[in-house]
A protein has these predicted regions:
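Bacterial Sec-dependent N-terminal signal peptides
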Residues: 1-5, 12, 16-53
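Generic alpha-helix initiation/capping and coil-helix boundary signal
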Residues: 8-9, 269
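Generic detector of ordered secondary-structure context
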Residues: 13, 50-53, 58, 124, ...
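Disulfide-rich extracellular modules and peptides
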Residues: 23, 68-71, 134
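Local sequence-structure signature of Cys/Sec-based thiol-disulfide redox active-site neighborhoods
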Residues: 45-97
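Short, conserved sequence motifs used for protein processing/export or organelle targeting and
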Residues: 91, 98-296
Length: 296
């Protein structure tokens, strides 16, 4: 990644020009905007914050028959809680070994098409679980790392480069009539960058109750039948790998998308949220993530 310094006055002028408008410009990718009642679900304004802090996305690859995975989930929760909103988590149920249904004790299948695609691309579950990625940054020949190393990687990112290169703005709604999420997503670049950048968005659900194997808890057969899954990846709101938004973006440029996703009957709107992020498609590195709960 190459940063190009920008004159402060020039940046302020760009900010005023690009971010003062209150209306999202058409066209929108992948969505027939006429299908959205913009009076009921209005598009948001977006103003860039020059002091936007860097945030980090941790993707935790888990499974309901992985007895060590709940410990990794606790580590993720602790990092989120201690970060002051700078760490965002996504729990991805993937792989045949620990995420496949195993009835009658573990009948559910929390796997998703997008989760399987991510797993195949980065080879996570073939290396064992629990494992995860921190901003999809490659170290050596691999992208994944064990949960005990997440904290050091997060701290290095937040301490070494505390100011973000981009800002994510999300406004999400639940359209009860059509049983769908509507997600307006903005990506604004605070610095000029080299690379080919994409914007992607996922649907996440908290408070999913189900069966989980959990070692060393004194449970019969290590089985917790009322385990609470948080940050559960439910699907992609954008296309599978997101949408191209910019090649070599300049400081002050802003890009806007709107997507919809129909919810499955078992998904609870009050527990849903949208996680979106901008990433460099040349190396998969996530530049900045964000998250928002839908307005019900």
């Amino acid at each position: 990644m190459i940063r190009n310094s920008a004159n402060g006055i020039f940046f302020l002028i760009l900010t005023a020009l690009f971010f003062s408008c209150d209306k999202i410009d058409a066209p929108y990718a992948e969505v027939n905007v006429s299908s959205i009642d913009t009076l009921q679900f209005p598009s948001p304004s977006f103003a860039i914050n020059p002091d936007e802090p860097r945030r980090v996305l941790i993707e935790d690859f888990t499974g309901h028959t992985c007895g060590n995975c709940p410990t990794a989930a606790i580590q993720l929760e602790n990092l989120i809680a201690s970060s002051g909103g700078k760490v965002i988590g996504v729990a991805i149920h993937a792989g045949e070994t620990f995420a496949a249904p195993a009835p009658p004790t573990y009948p559910e299948d929390y796997r998703t098409e997008v989760g399987d695609a991510i797993d195949a691309q980065f080879g996570i579950t073939s290396a064992g679980q629990p494992n995860g990625m921190v901003n999809r940054i490659k170290t050596g020949n691999v992208y994944y790392t064990i949960p005990n190393a997440w904290s050091n990687r997060v701290n290095a990112l937040l301490n070494n480069t505390p100011q973000a290169d981009a800002q994510i703005g999300i406004k999400a709604y639940y359209d009860e009539e059509k049983e769908r999420l509507i997600a307006y997503v903005h990506a604004g670049f605070l610095t000029s960058l080299s690379g080919n950048f994409r914007l992607a968005a996922y649907a996440i659900e908290d408070s999913v109750v189900g069966d989980q194997k959990w070692y060393n808890q004194g449970l019969p057969n290590d089985h917790d039948e009322n385990y609470v899954f948080n940050h559960t990846l439910r699907g992609n709101v954008s296309s599978l790998w997101g949408e191209d938004i910019a090649i070599n973006p300049q400081a002050g440029s802003v890009h806007r998308k709107v997507w919809t996703l129909k919810l499955k009957p078992e998904w609870k709107p009050k527990h849903m949220k949208v996680v979106a992020f901008v990433y460099n498609r040349d190396n998969f590195e996530i530049i900045q993530p964000g998250e928002a709960k839908p307005e019900l």
